[in-house]
Design a protein with these regions (language model features):
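RNA-contacting regions in translation and RNA-metabolism proteins
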Residues: 1-41, 47, 52-75
Length: 75
């Protein structure tokens, strides 16, 4: 899941070298934190939050398969 978010984020930002995804796992949940350059924040969130929502939806689909709860934080 971490690799998917990293791939998507790097493909839409202007500074892909600034993309960092960290992962925190607990028993049945996973929190992914996506850090991007402040100039690229708008691109990652997207118009009316559509890009961020699409990434979260993809994560939920993958999480159902693995039986975990997932959350994406964009900072």
């Amino acid at each position: 899941m971490k690799e998917l978010i990293e791939y998507i984020a790097k493909s839409i930002v202007n500074k892909p070298e600034a993309v960092v995804v960290t992962e925190e796992r607990s028993d049945d949940s996973l929190v992914l934190t996506l850090q991007v350059d402040p100039e690229d924040m708008g691109r990652v969130i997207g118009k009316q939050g559509r890009a961020a929502q699409a990434m979260r939806t993809l994560l939920r689909v993958m999480a159902v398969r693995e039986g975990v709860r997932v959350d994406l934080k964009i900072v």
